Amino acid sequence: AMDVQKPDVVLALGKRSLLTVNAAKRPAPLVLGAVRDVDYQYPGILMIPDPEVILERLLLLAPDVKRVHVVQKGEGEDIQLRGAKEYLASRGVELDIRHSNDLREAASIYADMLEKANASDAVWILQDGSYVNSAIFSLLLDAAWNKNLVVFSSNPLHVKHGALFAVYPDNKKMGASLGEIANQVLQKRAEP
């Protein structure tokens, strides 16, 4: 269809759309939206919530929190945490990031974390789940009730299962922003 219609710019929503567009050897510039991976070299919008938005909400709802625990999959930088440590430090809150390479290691980390936690602690579940399966989620929620901990998530699905809150995208604003990016791509292409 792209060969026949020859669009000026292509908007791909999600990884599957990107793969389809790339397989079609698109002749037009690409704007990418609704992906969770930063490895793509296209202009667009990621579906990863800004950590400052999440942490600001946490501190509004639970102002007594002094330490936030998070389990990160693997080593290295995680875009979901970019700027989080500095943001929390500026508000007198510590960010405790622990790294896990598999579910078993994560379960051990969560158990250790919860054993030492108190009412001034919060547990942040990252969007990818941070190896949180139903058993670990139940463990987190039990500790939340027993120790008066805050459990919050970057994944909206966790709220219906008991997380205090999560954030979700404003799809209309995201669509408008993607349209603006597409227009910017077209304008730059038209400039000498």
Model regions: which residues?
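Short hydrophobic alpha-helices and adjacent helix-cap/hinge residues
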Residues: A1-P192
